[in-house]
Curated annotation (Swiss-Prot):
Active site: 176
Gene designation: guaC
Pfam families reported for this sequence: IMPDH (PF00478)
GO-annotated molecular function: GMP reductase activity
Homology family: Belongs to the IMPDH/GMPR family. GuaC type 2 subfamily.
HAMAP family membership: GMP_reduct_type2
Reactions that this protein is recorded to catalyse: IMP + NH4(+) + NADP(+) = GMP + NADPH + 2 H(+)
Function (record text): Catalyzes the irreversible NADPH-dependent deamination of GMP to IMP. It functions in the conversion of nucleobase, nucleoside and nucleotide derivatives of G to A nucleotides, and in maintaining the intracellular balance of A and G nucleotides.
Annotated organism of origin: Streptococcus agalactiae serotype III (strain NEM316)
GO cellular component: cytosol; GMP reductase complex
Binding residues for NADP(+): 205-228
Record-linked PROSITE patterns: IMP_DH_GMP_RED (PS00487)
Protein name: GMP reductase
Keyword terms of this UniProt record: NADP, Oxidoreductase
Length: 327
């Protein structure tokens, strides 16, 4: 019964440190394996139009980071796969579940991407299960990520259908308004939902949404995530594809949700909004800081690698993280 499960979110949790066993935090290994590939960090910039484009994807792949290209320039996906493969890089794309996507997947047999993410708002559905099965039939070597979901039942069903990883999170993102528009979602209890889902998972889980600080990455891993998808922390960089806007002499970048009218091009079934974020500088600086902070987290966990984070104790202290602290 769900009412017996503790409900909390990232800001309510503090991890308890263990004895440090490394002489320098730089010795901590932040790498993670997904499928047959190892990546530098367990983070994924959200597959959103204002977060990633082909140039950002190529940069991430070249530097050893995982990425997922968004699905909103559909006709560009196949040429994108070829360009990445021609450069010796992995291809990681997104698909939806509409009828024409089946033909698209079949057309990839001659040059299959290493990763495909089935990307819809409510991933616990027959349409997603059928698409998983289709991809696995047509492209058996491709690693399939499916989502988004928010319950153990959903995780089990998608895994049983053939998904290699599931994406957990319904509406906790900064530009997602699903819980306001529909009354449903994991907003406000995303970390507890992750914990709940991970107990049922036999394959990797990707935590998606609700990440506001670098410490939230460590918390996600503690509660069962293999990787963490992040939107707002990756938005607003100089390289970000979001439109540059100047307000009162200050530069901002647009950041909007994948289910917003700005992405959809129409005001229909809108579950996202648009905000302006101050320009943050270069993406590589954020990635470096993220890695350094995660190395510090590993040192506090008393280990040398990410797995040590899974075994630390924690306390639930409501909203304690912001008591007198600012970043």
């Amino acid at each position: 019964m769900f009412n017996d499960i503790p409900v909390f979110d990232y800001e309510d949790i503090q991890l308890i440190p263990n004895k440090c066993i490394i002489s320098s935090r730089s010795q901590a290994d932040t790498s993670v394996k997904l499928g047959n590939y190892t990546f530098k960090l367990p983070v994924i910039p959200a597959n959103m139009q204002t977060i990633i484009d082909e140039e950002v994807a190529e940069t991430l792949a070249c530097e050893g980071y995982f990425y997922i290209m968004h699905r909103f320039n559909e006709e560009e996906r196949k040429p994108f796969i070829k360009r990445m493969h021609d450069k010796g890089l992995i291809a990681s794309i997104s698909v939806g579940v509409k009828d024409y996507e089946y033909d698209f997947v079949t057309s990839l047999k001659e040059d299959a991407p290493e990763f495909i993410t089935i990307d819809i708002a409510h991933g616990h559905s027959n349409s997603v299960i059928e698409m998983i099965q289709h991809i696995k039939q047509e492209l058996p070597e491709t690693f399939v990520i499916a989502g988004n979901v928010g319950t153990p039942e959903a995780v089990r069903e998608l895994e049983n259908a053939g998904a290699d990883a599931t994406k957990v999170g319904i509406g906790p993102g900064k530009v997602c308004i699903t819980k306001v528009k529909t009354g449903f979602g994991t907003g406000g209890w995303q970390l507890a939902a992750l914990r709940w889902c991970s107990k049922a998972a036999r394959k990797p889980i990707i935590a998606d949404g609700g990440i506001r600080t670098h410490g939230d990455i460590a918390k996600s891993i503690r509660f069962g995530a293999s990787m963490v998808m992040i939107g707002s922390l990756f938005a607003g960089h100089l390289e970000s594809p979001g439109k540059l806007v100047e307000v009162d002499g200050q530069q901002f970048k647009e950041y909007y949700g994948s289910a917003s009218e700005y992405q959809k091009g129409e005001h229909k079934n809108v579950e996202g909004k648009k905000i302006l974020l101050p320009v943050k500088g270069r993406l590589e600086d954020t990635l470096t800081e993220m890695q350094q902070d995660l190395q510090s987290s590993i040192s506090y966990a008393g280990g040398k690698e990410l797995d040590s984070l899974r075994h630390v104790d924690y306390v639930i202290v409501k909203n304690s993280i912001w008591n007198g602290d600012s970043i």
